[in-house]
Structures are given as structure tokens and as C-alpha cells.
Amino acid sequence: MFTVFLLVVLATTVGSFTLDRASDGRDAAANDKASDLIALTARRDPCCYHPTCNMSNPQICG
């Protein structure tokens, strides 16, 4: 009975470790998208933060 218990614990640990490693790839992809969005926001023209300038220059601010 103790052997069965050890096998269950081992299987659970291995399964958990494998699933955690798989989620690391998804987390990395999400982090890349977030950093791209931050970089895009940081590159915006300062004019875009002023409502008057923003409305006068839609080609710059989108």
C-alpha cells in the first residue's frame, strides 16, 4: 500500500512539473506582447498626449 502511495506522489509531482514547464512558454509569449505594447506606447509622439494637438494630427496619433 505504501508503494502505491509513493507512485501516486511521484506521478503527481512529475505531472505538475511538466505542466508548469509548458505554461512557461505561454507566459513568455504574453510577456513579449506586453513589452511590445509598452514599447509602442513609449514611442508615441508627445503631441498625442495633448488633446488639441492629437485632434489636429490624426496621422501621427492614429
From Swiss-Prot:
State a single Gene Ontology molecular function.
Answer: acetylcholine receptor inhibitor activity
Q: Which GO terms describe its cellular component?
A: extracellular region; host cell postsynaptic membrane
Write out the tissue specificity statement of the associated record.
Expressed by the venom duct.
Q: Determine the domain of life of the protein's source.
A: Eukaryota
Give residue numbers for the modification (Cysteine amide).
61
Which stretches of sequence are listed as region Lacks the Ser-Xaa-Pro motif that is crucial for potent interaction with nAChR? 49-51
Residues that the record marks as modified (4-hydroxyproline) are: 46
Query: Propeptide residues, per UniProt?
Result: 17-43
Its GO biological process annotations read:
venom-mediated perturbation of G protein-coupled receptor signaling in another organism
Q: Which UniProt keywords apply?
A: Acetylcholine receptor inhibiting toxin, Amidation, Disulfide bond, Hydroxylation, Ion channel impairing toxin, Neurotoxin, Postsynaptic neurotoxin, Secreted, Signal, Toxin
Q: Which PROSITE patterns does the protein's record reference?
A: ALPHA_CONOTOXIN
| Free-text comment about domains | The cysteine framework is I (CC-C-C). Alpha4/7 pattern.
What's its job?
Alpha-conotoxins act on postsynaptic membranes, they bind to the nicotinic acetylcholine receptors (nAChR) and thus inhibit them. Probable competitive antagonist of fish muscle acetylcholine receptor. Inhibits postsynaptic nicotinic acetylcholine receptors (nAChRs) from zebrafish (IC(50)=58-100 nM). Blocks mammalian nAChR composed of alpha-1/gamma and alpha-1/delta subunits. Blocks central nervous system nAChR composed of alpha-4-beta-2/CHRNA4-CHRNB2 subunits and peripheral nervous system nAChR composed of alpha-3-beta-4/CHRNA3-CHRNB4 subunits.
Q: Which family does it belong to?
A: Belongs to the conotoxin A superfamily.
What is this protein's record name? Alpha-conotoxin EI
